[in-house]
Amino acid sequence: MKKILIVGSSSDISQTLQKESFDFINLTSKDSEFNILDSSTFPKIKELDGLVYFPGTVNLRPFSNYREKDFQKDYEVNVLGLINILKHYQLSLNQNASIVTISSIAANFGMPFHASISMCKASVEALTRSLAAEWAPKIRLNCIAPSLVETKMTERLTNTESKKETIENKHPLKKIGETSDIANMISFLLSDKSRWITGQT
């Protein structure tokens, strides 16, 4: 059974993913000693067949209302944390290991009030592509960039029927994503069924 490290294991999508048939190791900020910006708090793991990085932010506001520390916090969670994890566990990854990162549709489409998150997630996609080329053929890296998915983190964006309808109508399929939609894609990318896919978003 593949051994998979999940970073941000308390997220709703992560909880759905953990119903799949993998041997999961969980890291979450709810662990008192774990700090995504401090690699000395990362547990030692000898071997891994895969890694999924979930930590993210939903910090939407007009550009004029952002403070420097808002951008900094979003970048730390979305990008620097990912870099720290990848650097720390690179040598633990087995041959043919698979890494899945999480971006957002906002990284590639201009959306109002998304200045900070779009910048951060574009960085995640660029890093994923770069490392996919650098770490091939031993390790595969792919990124998922979903539209809005119903989770606790996004519930303030969908907490009325009017809000939900507006968001649904913007999507070609006229519906909001569910956690299982993303978990199924991650499961596929972690599996050998995607063994000829790397560097994709």
Label every model-predicted segment:
Residues 66, 110-118, 130:
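Active-site loop-to-helix junction immediately N-terminal to the catalytic Tyr of the SDR YXXXK motif
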Residues 86, 120, 128:
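Active-site helix of classical SDR
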Residues 104:
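Residue(s) in the substrate-gating loop at a strand-loop-helix junction
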Residues 62-63, 70-75, 163-167:
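Substrate-binding pocket helix/loop in short-chain dehydrogenase/reductase
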Residues 175-201:
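C-terminal substrate-recognition "lid" of short-chain dehydrogenase/reductases
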